[in-house]
Each structure stands twice: as structure tokens, then as C-alpha cells.
Amino acid sequence: MVACLLHDIGYVRGILKDDDADGYVVDAAGGKVKLPRGSSDAALLMHHVDRSILFALDRLGTIDVFDAKRIARAIECTRFPVSIPPQDEQIEEEGSLLRAADLIGQLGDPHYLRKANALYYEFEEAGVNRQLGYGSPADLVDLYPQFYWNSVSPRVQTAIRYLNVTASGRQWIANLYSNVFRAERDVSLSGPQH
């Protein structure tokens, strides 16, 4: 649960002890990045997982009721795609469920496709649109089904089985697939227009 609460805290500027006017800490060695004037927290997209991990280790590492390393390993699993394989089965399950909750929570939002404009400009600020193949907000919607089926679906199936047990969980599944269906069918007014 704590990893759920902390996995995106790395977007917030000033949360790490050494964040200052010279920049924001982005790794355990104390490396920093200086953001351009006027940047939003979205500019930390490429560093937010590392920053979240550093925050968890620093703030929870001395509190006995928390296993800060376990929380940090679960947060690592929210990096998309996962870059470091979990070291044990328990972390694999916890981390994969956290990753699935993160993905389903975003992609199952009934307004997700309408948010493509804002998401595009967040990606633009972070400098990742080109590498993702996005030239406009409409590309996020056009490429969404391929992204979902190839990159997301294989990583959320266990969570979908759990969600299918409750009515509210089934609603999240329906929302998730509705967004994919609408993007596949090019339903107008679902997001950025061509």
C-alpha cells in the first residue's frame, strides 16, 4: 500500500534533501538535473521512478514498521517497461500488481482519451514524443490500441482476474476495454481530432 502512495512522488520537486536551486536529484550518486525555466513537474518523467525510490529509502529506511527496500523494489516495477527483473517471487507479484494498478488506473479512466492533448504536452516537455512515435496528440489515440495490446495487456492479466471478482473491478475492466475499443474504432469526440 505504501508503494502505491509513493510510486509517483518523484515528480514532486523539493522532496529530496539535496533538491535545490542547482537542480533535482535523479540518482543514488547524487546526480542532478536542472529543469528549464517554466517547466512543470512533468519534466521529471524520465527520473520520477528513481526519485520515488530515493524518497522511499530515505524517509522510510529508519522506520521499523516499513521494509523500505521492499517498497523500493515494488516502486521499481512501475518503471515502464520494467528494466530490472525482481529478485524473488513475492516482489514479482507485489511489483506486478502495483504496475498493473498504475496502468489500469490511468488507462481505465473514462476520460483517458480526452486527456491525450495534455498527455502529449507532458511527453513533449519530457522530450519523449519522438521516441514514442508521437507527432501530435492524435497519434496518442491512433497508436493507443497497439500500445495497449502489445505492451500493457500482457502485464495486467493477473490484476484483471482479481478485478473481475467485484462489480467495481469489472467497471474498471469495462472502462479499460472501452477506451481501447473507441481508439480502435476511431469514434469521434473521444480525443484529439484528426
What residue ranges belong to the model's regions?
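Histidine- and acidic-residue-rich, metal-dependent catalytic cores
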Residues: 41-83
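Divalent metal-dependent phosphate-bond-processing catalytic cores, especially two-metal-ion Mg2+/Mn2+ enzymes
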Residues: 6, 10-17, 61-65, 76-194
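Short, solvent-exposed segments of well-ordered alpha helices
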Residues: 39-43, 88-91
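Post-HEXXH active-site segment of zinc metalloproteases
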Residues: 15-38
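Active-site alpha-helix of zinc metalloproteases
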Residues: 2-3
